[in-house]
Each structure stands twice: as C-alpha cells, then as structure tokens.
C-alpha cells in the first residue's frame, strides 16, 4: 500500500516529468538524493560532493537536493519511493537489494568474504561489479556506482571476544537473510530494525548490540550506549548509488554525460575518504572512553572464521553459487 508521503512526492515527480518534456522551460532538473546516514559519514560526504559536481558539470541544468538522516524516507521505504519516482537517487546499503528480489547482492554480506579493501575493489570496480549492477535494470533501477563505507565491528554491553560470547544476545541487523544466518551461526538472536531506530533500541535495551563500520557507530553516537566493541572486520558495509531507470533514460544525453562524470569523480572521492573516516571515528570513540575496544588476536579471528565461513555454503542457493564463485575468483586475481 502506498504511503501518503510517497503519493505526495509522486505529484512532484509527475510535474518533473512534464517539465522534462517541455524543452523551452529553463527550470533546472531536480534530483532528490535521499539517504539514511549523517552528512559527515563517507556516504554523506560523497552525496555532498556529487551535488557540487553534478551542478558544475551540467552547467546548472541539474539541481541536486540531498536529504540525509532519513529526512524523506526510512531505509525500508526508500527503494519503493525510488521505483515509484518519488525520489530520483539513493545510495542504499547493498543488503537492501536482497529483499527487493536481487539476491545476488547479498554476496557482499557474507562474513569474511573480503580480506581487505584491495580484494573488495577488484569486485566493485571490476566486471563482477558491473554484472551485479546490471541485474537491477529489471527492477526499474539503474546502478551507477559502488561506494564504500567500511568493514564492520561488533558491539554490545558485554565483551565479544569469542563466538560463544554472542549466545542469546539480541543483535540488530539490516533486513538480510545472510546477516540473519551470520547471527544465528554465532548463537545470537537477530533483530531486524531500521537504522534510525537503533540508538534508542540500544539505549533502552530492546536490543543488546549491533554491527556497524566505526563511522556509522560514531556519527550515530552508539558508543554512548555500548560498553564493549570488537574490531572484528568480519563483514563489509557498502552502498550502490542508484537512480530511477525511467528518469535516467529520459534525461537529455548531455545532462546524463555530465552526471556520469560527476558520479565517477564523486565515487573516487567517497571511496578515497572511507577508510580514513572509519579510522578517525574508531580513534575518536577510543578517546571518548565510553566503549572498551578489543582487537581480535590471530587465534580469536580463526575461531570467528571457523564459525562464520560456513554461512557461504548455507547461502549459496539463495545468492547463487555462480555469483559467489565469480566474486571469490575476482578477489583472487
């Protein structure tokens, strides 16, 4: 059922469509770029950079309006809004495409599938990444780029050193069957919850812990309500920058070319700062002193991997064995 907000936004989208069909109008083409995180995260800064460059490279023909912190839609609502044309651009986390029916993207959620950023970028910046983005076309979505956030850490109010430490803990996750399997493998109880609701849920004890890259944990002040965190780097959180396909295909060719250039440069910028931003956030949380951080030893990491890597085979039928194989082959190149 359509929400009132989406229906209201559709009125504006219809007006935009009419404006595009009348070349004589000098009004700029408006691109509403919605996302759910803070402006000072890697994604938030990437969106701001795209806003700047898009207007520059289209000579003012495009006006990008960035809406951070779920100002327009929560993360569960965003994709529907995009498909209906209520917003034109999003950068949802890659876990969001599984529930949409493009389960290949859940390969990014598999624990310990990427050793480091170098291995990751062989996928997101290579042929495997292009193949994955192309699968969105059938859903009325055009994929433009992959943006990094970073590798995730685990947090809770009790130490998380070994897999047994998760037994019975209620852990917040995004809506993802892979992340459910990950938490189940650890003996935790996965709790699907919108990102905007996590701080309060941690504060009130609705959930015991969660997983996030440091930048997300820090900018949402989750370290204020989590006593312990483990730098596990067990999983990756990234985004796909996407647009409504009908909107994109209807843009004048020169405008689309300018936007593609802006996106390419914004992607280099966003990915270039992601690792640095996470390192800064981690250090800032350590300095704040409200959370005790633990670095896994080699022995502890091996124990985590032993418990979590069987999730790869468990999810092969859902994600696609060929997709998993293609990603692993790309990382090994």
Swiss-Prot record:
GO terms for biological process: C4-dicarboxylate transport; transmembrane transport. One of its GO terms (cellular component) is outer membrane-bounded periplasmic space. Keywords: Periplasm, Signal, Sugar transport, Transport. Disruption phenotype: Deletion mutant is unable to transport succinate, and does not grow on D-malate, L-malate, succinate or fumarate as the sole carbon source under aerobic conditions in the dark. The keyword Transport applies. It is found in: Periplasm. Pfam families: DctP. Gene3D superfamilies: Bacterial extracellular solute-binding protein, family 7. CDD domains: PBP2_TRAP_SBP_like_1. InterPro entries: DctP_fam, TRAP_DctP, TRAP_DctP_sf. The complex comprises the extracytoplasmic solute receptor protein DctP, and the two transmembrane proteins DctQ and DctM. Part of the tripartite ATP-independent periplasmic (TRAP) transport system DctPQM involved in C4-dicarboxylates uptake. Binds C4-dicarboxylates such as fumarate, succinate, L-malate and D-malate. PANTHER family: C4-DICARBOXYLATE-BINDING PROTEIN DCTB, PTHR33376. NCBIfam families: dctP, TRAP_S1. Belongs to the bacterial solute-binding protein 7 family. This is C4-dicarboxylate-binding periplasmic protein DctP. The lineage of its organism: Bacteria, Pseudomonadati, Pseudomonadota, Alphaproteobacteria, Rhodobacterales. The gene is dctP.
């Amino acid at each position: 059922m359509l929400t009132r907000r989406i229906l209201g936004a559709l009125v504006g989208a219809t007006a935009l469509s009419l404006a595009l069909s009348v070349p004589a109008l000098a009004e700029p083409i408006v691109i509403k770029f919605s996302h759910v995180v803070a402006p000072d995260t890697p994604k938030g800064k990437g969106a701001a950079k795209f806003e700047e460059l898009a207007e520059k490279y289209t000579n003012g023909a495009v006006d990008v309006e960035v809406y951070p912190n779920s100002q327009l839609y929560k993360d569960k609502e965003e994709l529907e809004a995009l498909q209906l044309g209520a917003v034109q651009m999003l950068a949802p986390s890659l876990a969001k495409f599984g529930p949409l029916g493009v389960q290949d993207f859940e390969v990014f959620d598999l624990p310990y599938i990427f050793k480091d950023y170098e291995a990751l970028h062989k996928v997101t910046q290579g042929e495997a990444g292009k193949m994955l983005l192309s699968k969105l076309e059938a859903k009325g979505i055009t994929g433009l780029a992959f943006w990094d956030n970073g590798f995730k850490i685990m947090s809770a109010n009790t130490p998380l050193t070994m897999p047994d430490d998760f037994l019975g803990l209620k852990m917040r996750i995004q809506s993802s069957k892979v992340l459910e399997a990950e938490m189940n493998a650890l003996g935790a109880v996965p709790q699907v919850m919108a990102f905007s609701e996590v701080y309060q849920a941690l504060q009130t004890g609705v959930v015991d812990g969660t997983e996030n890259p440091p930048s997300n944990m820090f900018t949402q002040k989750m370290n204020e309500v989590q006593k312990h965190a483990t730098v596990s780097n067990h999983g990756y959180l990234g985004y796909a920058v996407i647009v409504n396909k009908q909107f994109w295909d209807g843009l004048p060719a020169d405008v689309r070319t300018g936007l593609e250039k802006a996106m390419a440069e914004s992607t280099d910028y966003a990915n270039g700062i992601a690792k640095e931003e996470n390192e800064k956030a981690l250090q800032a949380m350590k300095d704040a002193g409200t959370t005790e951080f633990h670095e896994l030893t080699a022995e502890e990491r091996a124990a985590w991997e032993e418990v979590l890597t069987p999730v790869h085979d468990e999810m092969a039928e859902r994600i696609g064995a060929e997709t998993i194989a293609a990603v692993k082959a790309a990382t090994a190149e």
